[in-house]
Amino acid sequence: MPAASPSVRRPEARRATAHFVQAALRELAADVAAGTEVPFALDTRGRYGGPALYEYRPLYRAFVEARMDRLVRLPDYDTAISSLGGDPAVLGVARDHAPDADTDEIALRSAVLVPLVVGVAEGAGGFDFDDRVFDGIFDRMLSDVAQTRRSFTGFAPVVGLRAVDGVHDLGQDIHARRITPAELAEAWPECQGLLPERYGLARDRLLALELDVALPRVDDVELPDTARRFARAVLALRIVFGGPITVGPVLFERVDWAPRAVRALPASVTQNLPGEPARLDPQRLYLVRALADRMADAEVHGGPIAVALSRWATASGATVSAERAAGLAASVEPLLGADGAGHHAVAMRAAALVGANAADREDIAIAMRSALRLARPDAPITDTEQLARVVGDVARSVLAAALDHGADASQLGAMLDAVLLGSRPRPQSVTNLVRSA
């Protein structure tokens, strides 16, 4: 015999929730009949380089949530909550989907009842109850209950990065791929105001970071820190490819394909940066993955790498080129000047690490010394925009080398002194890859 559908297996819950949804839709329809309008969003459509097209999308969720204080007073509300709350499996899914809920009642309301009312309204195109639409949503929810594992997904739009079509593995369960505003709007209709300007239209605004993991359905499982993982990925992309790569300003999370939360991202990876968009080279993604893993280790153990990364991320967003150049040069001091050797030693060590030949090393040393002197009141006037670009490339190379050395990064200064003395060769692989970006 074919397996019974989920709604057949839980007929009491289905009946109680259907009665509440019907009552809620009648209440909402009465508001519309009285002249209240459903708010709407204009979703952007089109292709980069072409005109923007707009699609009208009613925001049923906002309309429903604004009236929940009335809907919870409907007689069928308590019956639905009692029926759903009596099922431990349903209650567990509700807690997963509404992690910030203070009570089980709020979790069931946010994760089950509101999505049902909103889903039926969206599926029916208004506030008429449709059995088929209701059953489809209710059965999908109960299918989640039957699963022994749950899917956890996070999205965040990327700016300042171009790539060929495909899915690009950035490590730590994160991928970069093209995603349209329409795809995001399917789960988050209100997302249009939370996306970067011209997202989905400009060539460097077509990608998103996506975290997708399967987790056991148990109460004490630790959910991924999506914001921190995305921040590592963006910083690793910036180090390897350069360019004004940013993400956010917010990320979108969902569990089992149902919206879970919209969260803020760290300012260090959301602030606008100067420069031309970078191009993702799939051949260098192995380095992005390696650097992101080393950043995770640095977050745990701290030390000079963590300090240097924090300074570099902050300095990269400086709007004044002189401040940016000085900050980028100072960001590598915890790595190259931890022994207190001074600015000259930091500049020489950076040149020894990054310079490809004698002339290149001389230029780097001069640039680093100039940038480190910018904080002084008697600093000479220079082309600080060009200086910031040169020092920025040097800082990226130093950070890549330090992360590549891992726990030995504290000895980077001593190692480079040996390079300057000619007693050991210059490490080349990582710094060459980063500088040629």
Predicted regions and their residues:
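Actinobacteria-biased recognition of intrinsically disordered, low-complexity terminal regions
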Residues: M1-H19, L420-A437
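Amphipathic alpha-helical interface elements
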Residues: P2-A89, V93-D96, A101-A111, A124-R140, ...
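Charged, non-catalytic interaction/linker regions at domain boundaries
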Residues: D78-E323, H405-A437
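Short amphipathic C-terminal alpha-helix that caps PH/PH-like domains
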Residues: F230-V234, V332, V391-L399
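Charged/polar positions within long, soluble alpha-helices
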Residues: L336-G340, L372-P380, R396-A407
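Histidine-centered, metal-coordinating catalytic motifs and their short helical/loop contexts
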Residues: A358-G392
